[in-house]
């Protein structure tokens, strides 16, 4: 056994074994078929009891709702993640911290947007993802500009380093909030990519392609979402993460795109992305581009488990569980609203 593998096992072998065991409990296609047959949320709860979720809803005395199921799913994932984080040595500890930063960004944006729409902070905080919670979160509503937000709250969080490009005295309207979200994600992805490169070895081999895809997905989505808005091409191009396969030529083409067809033309230069855009339809039951991106992400994360002695399995597990949560919540929503025609529109994992 090589020295690096030996040292990996000394510090992180136990946790890697544990995360692989947890991965074995991810729902399979037969589980989803059973869940989709359920008539009520109570039926859904019973079916989930026969899986690795076990009695995760057993202590719930309130009438079961989709939001309660969603919250309990997130709580279960958070408990598992915190166990990994509490037992991790460096550099795994920092790697796990990086995973939480994307949820912190989402939480901040959710709180700012909610405050903009006059929603009370007490109503917004429970909607935040527990993996991205931090102490100063509830004070977000006092900030009127990105600079105030940074000085009052962000400066003492790990996101401070990603915030340098976001500092402005602009008011926080919906457009500026969306620009802030994309600038934060750009800085975050580029920093995470650099960290994985520095780690080297199998972690770099597994994680860098995953983060490259995430960067490119964001570039495609930013471009498509910008059509019909006030965001000009120059501003749009500044939001693209530069650690993906599209950099530099693909990003230049996206920066000049005027419509969805030109975005698709850019994708055609990259075999992997060409296939994703080709399978997209707009009819009922046809897959959206978002679905295709999720499917590709799932595929990459499942493949991460084919190699040993790397940190990528922790990232992959969290992302697979996140997709699993989305799937269960989707099925629960369809049952709750008696809208069964779309109940099978989830993203299978295994």
UniProtKB/Swiss-Prot annotation:
UniProt keyword list: Hydrogen ion transport, Ion transport, Transport
SUPFAM superfamilies from the UniProt entry: V-type ATP synthase subunit C
A GO MF term: proton-transporting ATPase activity, rotational mechanism
Pfam families reported in the protein's UniProt record: vATP-synt_AC39 (PF01992)
GO CC annotation terms, alphabetical: proton-transporting V-type ATPase, V0 domain
Subunit structure: V-ATPase is a heteromultimeric enzyme made up of two complexes: the ATP-hydrolytic V1 complex and the proton translocation V0 complex. The V1 complex consists of three catalytic AB heterodimers that form a heterohexamer, three peripheral stalks each consisting of EG heterodimers, one central rotor including subunits D and F, and the regulatory subunits C and H. The proton translocation complex V0 consists of the proton transport subunit a, a ring of proteolipid subunits c9c'', rotary subunit d, subunits e and f, and two accessory subunits.
PANTHER family found in the cross-reference section: VACUOLAR ATP SYNTHASE SUBUNIT AC39
Function: Subunit of the V0 complex of vacuolar(H+)-ATPase (V-ATPase), a multisubunit enzyme composed of a peripheral complex (V1) that hydrolyzes ATP and a membrane integral complex (V0) that translocates protons. V-ATPase is responsible for acidifying and maintaining the pH of intracellular compartments and in some cell types, is targeted to the plasma membrane, where it is responsible for acidifying the extracellular environment. May play a role in coupling of proton transport and ATP hydrolysis. Regulator of osteoclast fusion and bone formation.
Family of the protein in this entry: Belongs to the V-ATPase V0D/AC39 subunit family.
Name assigned to this protein: V-type proton ATPase subunit d 2
UniProt organism field: Xenopus tropicalis
Taxonomic lineage: Eukaryota, Metazoa, Chordata, Craniata, Vertebrata
């Amino acid at each position: 056994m090589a020295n690096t593998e030996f040292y990996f096992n000394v510090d992180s072998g136990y946790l890697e074994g544990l995360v692989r065991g947890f991965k074995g409990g991810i729902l399979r296609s037969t589980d989803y078929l059973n869940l989709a047959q359920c008539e009520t949320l109570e039926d859904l709860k019973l079916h989930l009891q026969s899986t690795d979720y076990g009695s995760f809803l057993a202590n719930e005395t309130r009438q079961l709702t989709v939001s309660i199921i969603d919250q309990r799913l997130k709580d279960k994932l958070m408990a598992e993640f915190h166990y990994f984080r509490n037992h991790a040595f460096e550099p795994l500890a920092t790697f796990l911290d990086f995973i939480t930063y994307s949820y912190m960004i989402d939480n901040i944006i959710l709180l700012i947007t909610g405050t903009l729409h006059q929603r009370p902070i007490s109503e917004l905080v429970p909607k935040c993802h527990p993996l991205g919670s931090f102490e100063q979160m509830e004070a977000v509503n006092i900030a009127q500009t990105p600079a105030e937000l940074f000085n009052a709250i962000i400066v003492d969080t790990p996101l401070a380093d990603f915030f340098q490009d976001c500092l402005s005295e602009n008011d926080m309207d919906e457009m500026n909030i969306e620009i802030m979200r994309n600038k934060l994600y750009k800085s975050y992805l580029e920093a995470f990519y650099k960290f994985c490169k520095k780690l080297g070895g199998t972690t770099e081999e597994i994680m860098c392609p995953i983060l490259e895809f995430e960067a490119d997905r964001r570039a495609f989505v930013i471009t498509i979402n910008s059509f019909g808005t006030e965001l000009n091409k120059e501003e749009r191009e500044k939001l693209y993460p530069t650690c993906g396969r599209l950099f530099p030529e693909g990003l230049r083409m996206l920066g000049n795109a005027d419509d969805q067809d030109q975005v698709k033309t850019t994708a055609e230069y990259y075999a992997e992305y060409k296939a994703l855009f080709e399978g997209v339809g707009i009819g009922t039951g046809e897959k959206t581009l978002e679905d295709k991106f999720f499917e590709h992400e799932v595929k990459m994360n499942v493949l991460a488990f084919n190699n040993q002695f790397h940190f990528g399995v922790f990232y992959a597990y969290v992302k697979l569980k996140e997709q699993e949560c989305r799937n269960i919540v989707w099925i629960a929503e369809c049952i709750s609203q008696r809208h069964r025609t779309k109940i099978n529109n989830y993203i299978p994992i295994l």
